[in-house]
């Protein structure tokens, strides 16, 4: 949210792509986070999320990031929301696919949340986020907080990502 040139570089992999639109990029300086909204073909979005996460990994070090909003990773959450004929079941499948791919590509641990959660304690995002990036280093080592994808060890500069399927807020 505070570094506009960095935000421009990070969202570049999402611009002018076939199959989806980059609907909004909303930086918030107080929270020091940026909400990015994509709308379109889920498979196209998933393909674009991989280089996007790679760019975020290059640009953001969570060890020096601070802001008012609770956070656990440089890309904090990736929610899939059923609209335009997509079902919640579709969104759960997309969440699982993108979570597995991001973990495979970048060794970033993934927690599935909301409708995609595999455990009841992971349905609510604030429960997963509790302790934030700094506390996640120890939390992830507990058996009950082992990630859905990846090792029980946070990415040293990126943290972890919550990937979910949920209805619009």
Name what the model sees in each region.
Residues 1-169:
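Long, contiguous binding/interaction regions
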